[in-house]
Amino acid sequence: MSAGSVTAALHRELWISWASLLRSYAAANGLNSHQFAVIEFGEEEIVVRAGSKWVRFTHAERESGDGSKAPFALNEDGTVTLDGKMDEMDFAAERVTRELMR
């Protein structure tokens, strides 16, 4: 495999992992809430909805239902860069879903 195809394959796996973490943390946050989240997952975007709130991820951006946007990136080391801050993928997914479901 060429370096480009390895990077593309790694990014696909990171994208799937990000969606899975969002789903898991949304379910966990839903245990202590009167609402639940719905995750829409595709190759180009992931949307998490909880009640009237939503957050949408593309490969380069996070957009919220309130109109806010922020840069977003999945890094090869398994971290996430969101709004200029780098964090472990699981911590970022927990924070995103917790904020969405409050």
Regions of interest found by a model, annotated:
Residues M1, M86-M89, M101:
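Detector for methionine-enriched segments
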